[in-house]
Amino acid sequence: LGDVYKRQIQNAYNLLNRTFEVGGSEIAHREDVGLLAYSPIAQGYLSGKYQNGALPKGSRKELFDRLQRYEGPYAEEAIQAYLDIGTKYNIDPSQLANQFVTSKPFVTSNIIGATNMDQLKLAVTSIEVNLTEEIYSDIEKAFQKHGNVAS
């Protein structure tokens, strides 16, 4: 992970919500503050489990009915773009999302929210995923097209 920081800030940060990159990361670097990034897979949306209106039994969305942050008018299209990148490079979408967050130099800790052992294994092994320049380029193209879709 990134440098060792004595002070931390905790913000949501993921492929769909990169607002911290604009200003926040610069100020944090200047003030020697690291980012504890939470919601790296966007409340599960970047795993693909909620695509096309799916509502898996036992999921947080089903249990608590309060996960609308990533359901704005352009969110599903943006999510699909990142899922397609994972498919293109044969990378599990959760691992792609987690490693994207972990790879950022301003991130000192990636706060995962695994609710079962399979999710935990995917999160922990995401560190082994090599995000090449080509993958980062595809991620940036998707971000340029869709931007921050968290509401």
What are these regions (language model features)?
Residues 22-26, 99:
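Alpha-helical segments flanking ligand/cofactor-binding loops in enzyme cores
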Residues 6-10, 34-36, 108-111:
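Structural preference for beta-strand elements that scaffold enzyme active sites
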Residues 13-17, 39-46, 100, 116:
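Glycine-rich beta-alpha junction loops
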Residues 1-5:
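Short, small-residue-biased leader/transition segments that mark boundaries at the very start
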Residues 102-103, 117-144, 148-151:
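C-terminal amphipathic alpha-helical "assembly" element
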Residues 26-85:
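Glycine-rich, positively charged active-site loop/lid region within alpha/beta enzyme cores that binds
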Residues 9, 28, 35-38, 82, ...:
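Conserved, mostly hydrophobic/aromatic
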Residues 71-128:
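Conserved short secondary-structure transition element at the edge of the structured enzyme core
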